[in-house]
Amino acid sequence: MLKRISVQQLTLGMHLKEFCGSWMEHPFWRTGFVLTNPKDLEAVMASSIKEVWIDSDKGLDVAAGAPAVSEAESEAQVEAELKQVSDGQRQIAPIPAALELQRAAKICLHGKQAVVSMFEEARMGKAVDGGGARLLVEEISDSVSRNPGALISLARLKTADDYTYMHSVAVCAMMVALAKQLGLDEAQTRSAGLAGLLHDLGKAVMPAEVLNKPGKLTDAEFAIIKSHPVEGHKMLMVGVNVDPMVLDVCLHHHEKVDGSGYPKGLKGDEISLYAKMGAVCDVYDAITSNRPYKSGWDPAESLRKMAEWTNGHFDPKIFQAFVKSMGIYPVGSLVRLTSGRIGVVIEQTAKSLTTPCVKVFFSTKSNMRIVPQVIDLSRTDGTEKIAGREDPAKWRFSDLNELWSGLPKAPW
């Protein structure tokens, strides 16, 4: 039986199923093993992780009566939290996703090339081309205004090799969407986008063999990676009239509200609004993307994981606004409908976060592919609903991304 417990309850002999936190910030590159080495237990205790999942069927259990949350209880808590932000009208996108996707693909390609150039300039000690960066943010912001789901979802289709560059584009787009959801003015929204674009500039000077290492990082290597906010801040300071918001997000996007983040261990209101926004956007893109050491999670699953971590990692109000901007089932999420059909979310609708447009293509009743059909769940009068999310790894649909994007592969 899976149980979520505090790391303080963790003992040798327990089967460590999963960490309650982003995999970039715990001391292991794998999970799903029995803790037998005292040094491994010490490493978990010394990390910023506060809770873990254990499997009591494969290892020791917590003591009778000890506090623990079952998988069903945790899921109910998360769904209840997401339900709180699901009601209410959404602003409908002016342009359908299908029409914006082609234009967004070109912006992603241009964006990746621009970020590559920025990183190369930074490595040589040159100031970032602020004018070029602002023009790119303007392009991305305009695309998000036309249809936020298009570019944000496309930018997720990065490979492990181009992750660092496309991650900057993706976080920029999500920062813009989140700023709009929070009601920030146009100037603040563009600044938030610029901060997202440049937040990881410090990775330009991280050793490639460490940045792209497919296995567990040593303590020394992890310390190197954790230096990238400070290094990026130094690089940005080379420029003239750099927006303070950009500097702030670059330096503090790995801070957590409980004080367990880095580089300064800030907590609560010590962290600015914009750095809190950056933290949410950064983690979401990281855990939904394929990395050298791990495949990305499904978008809907990722939001639910982040909801589990909200109390320690994120500002709850910022996270709720992020969910509103993305949808409870973001574009690209694999879902099962009450009819037994499986489909992929292709667009959000204005009515509710729980009634997106879904392209169904598989029947669980016949266990066969069916002719793809787009269903707007906001117009079914409740006769068809999302019954739950599905694990893409279980079904292994090789064309899942093509089904929602219309593109056979990422064009960058």
Regions found by a protein language model. Give the residues of each.
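Membrane-cytosol interface segments
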Residues: M1-V128, I386-W412
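Histidine- and acidic-residue-rich, metal-dependent catalytic cores
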Residues: A98-W412
